[in-house]
Amino acid sequence: MPGSTAEAARPEILELRPNGWVPNNERLPVLVYRGVVDVSGRDPAAAFEALFGRTGWPARWRNGVFPYHHYHTAAHEVLGFAAGRARLMLGGPDGAEVEVAAGDVAVLPAGTGHRRLEASGDFLVVGAYPPGQSPDNCRDAPTPEMAARIAGLPYPESDPVSGQGGPLTTLWQRP
């Protein structure tokens, strides 16, 4: 994608602290990329699947975002918004409201609480994870084992939007 919007993208950065029962991830920020995928084609979800495949984050599903707070301890997650618009809550109850639209991407580090507050009828998301990671669906406070899993989860080798050397690889660094 030489010269593409995705290649030149700079994300919005959202740092989330623990919030009630939602652990979030104090070391790794949420990254939100705006308008990085052209969704004017016949199958915009396929454009996200192709992008994520090229950048080493194989796409796993097409659907939406659950309407309840949840987080993952066993996977970092990228959400590609292929159609419609939505208002999400990131970080758990009373967290940060984020509006997303077709063409946007959100990268959620393990532990990040997220839920859909409202969405247009055509809202469609492509979800992907780094190789070797599979999401669990957590809706309660983390046990010590769950917290250790979040802290020890390997960092992705590439940014799901820009690939090797993309913003994630510099913004997500071990201390």
Task: Give the positions of each predicted feature.
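A short, N-terminal "cap"/entry segment at the start of jelly-roll beta-barrel domains
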Residues: 1-69, 169-175
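Double-stranded beta-helix
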Residues: 117-175
